[in-house]
Amino acid sequence: LSTDIVAPPV
């Protein structure tokens, strides 16, 4: 999905 978290919310 385009809403997949590919990077941790820093």
UniProtKB/Swiss-Prot annotation:
Temperature dependence as stated in the record: Optimum temperature is 37 degrees Celsius with azocasein as substrate. Incubation at 55 degrees Celsius for 90 minutes reduces activity to 20% of its maximum.
Key words, A-Z: Calcium, Hemorrhagic toxin, Hemostasis impairing toxin, Hydrolase, Metal-binding, Metalloprotease, Platelet aggregation inhibiting toxin, Protease, Secreted, Toxin
Residues binding Ca(2+): 10
Gene Ontology process terms (BP): proteolysis
EC number(s) from the headed UniProt entry: 3.4.24.-
Molecular functions per Gene Ontology: metal ion binding; metallopeptidase activity; toxin activity
Principal place of residence: secreted
pH dependence: Optimum pH is 7.5 with azocasein as substrate. Incubation at a pH of below 6.0 or above 9.5 results in an abrupt decrease in activity.
Disulfide bridges in this chain: none
Tissue: Expressed by the venom gland.
Activity regulation, short description: Inhibited by DTT, EDTA and L-cysteine, but not by the serine protease inhibitor PMSF. Activated by calcium, unaffected by magnesium, inhibited by zinc.
Entry superkingdom: Eukaryota
Record localization: Secreted
Entry's Gene Ontology cellular component terms: extracellular region
Enzyme class: hydrolase
Keyword Protease in annotation: yes
UniProt entry tagged with the keyword Transmembrane helix: no
Family: Belongs to the venom metalloproteinase (M12B) family.
Function summary: Snake venom zinc metalloprotease that hydrolyzes the alpha chain of fibrinogen (FGA) but not the beta or gamma chains. Has caseinolytic activity. Induces hemorrhage after intradermal injection into mice. Intramuscular injection into the gastrocnemius muscle of mice causes hemorrhage, edema, myonecrosis, increase in serum creatine kinase levels and multifocal lung hemorrhage. Inhibits collagen-induced platelet aggregation, but not thrombin- or ristocetin-induced platelet aggregation.
Record's subunit section: Monomer.
Protein name: Snake venom metalloproteinase patagonfibrase
Lineage start: Eukaryota, Metazoa, Chordata, Craniata, Vertebrata
